[in-house]
Amino acid sequence: MKVRSSVKKICEKCKIVRRGGRVFVICENPRHKQKQG
């Protein structure tokens, strides 16, 4: 899980999701998981 100020899709399978006022990126590739913090 990477914590970044700006989250971006890295590949086509990345999805941007909002949970509890936070922005996450979920992907099949665990290295692409990101959180906005």
UniProtKB/Swiss-Prot annotation:
One of its GO terms (molecular function) is structural constituent of ribosome. One of its GO terms (cellular component) is ribosome. One of its GO terms (biological process) is translation. Pfam families: Ribosomal_L36. Signal peptide: none annotated. Keywords: Ribonucleoprotein, Ribosomal protein. The keyword Ribonucleoprotein applies. Disulfide bonds: none annotated. NCBIfam families: rpmJ_bact. Belongs to the bacterial ribosomal protein bL36 family. This is Large ribosomal subunit protein bL36. It comes from Dictyoglomus turgidum (strain DSM 6724 / Z-1310).
